[in-house]
Amino acid sequence: MGLFTKDIKTMNDLFVHQLQDIYYAEKQLVKALPKMAEKANDKQLKQGFLTHLDETKIHVQRLEQVFQMHGAEVKAVNCPAIDGIIKEADEVAGEVDDKSVLDAALINAAQAAEHYEIVRYGSLIAWAKQLGRNDVASMLQKTLDEEKATDKKLTTLAESRINLRAAS
């Protein structure tokens, strides 16, 4: 089912489709984060990626709970957006020789993924509330809060040291 196809007729259809989209995205990030951690030079950045990997695994489990709570099939649909973000990160990482610049590029890629997730979770929460599913909205809010916290940590790390090293 593609976005804006005939298969999406109701708010509930849209909600379930976006759940499937973010489920796919989170599962792809579970695969990508170890590679990003391996490429990272800065120890704090490397550890941040590994910590977020653990959180992302919990996000996948939480989404599986949300599917069940909502009575929907646990299913992932391809998400070209997250695939593109991950592909671009891989390509850039392969082109950057300077380790400090690579760390800055990795943060940029991670934040692109975070911002995508933040938008998706924000919409899902609003739609869950409209559908009378405050229980589901509450579960999704936990993940949104964690995604925002990760984004803030990445910004702090970039601004306090990574970007400074990359520029020198």
Predicted segments, located by residue:
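Amphipathic alpha-helical hairpins
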Residues: 1-168
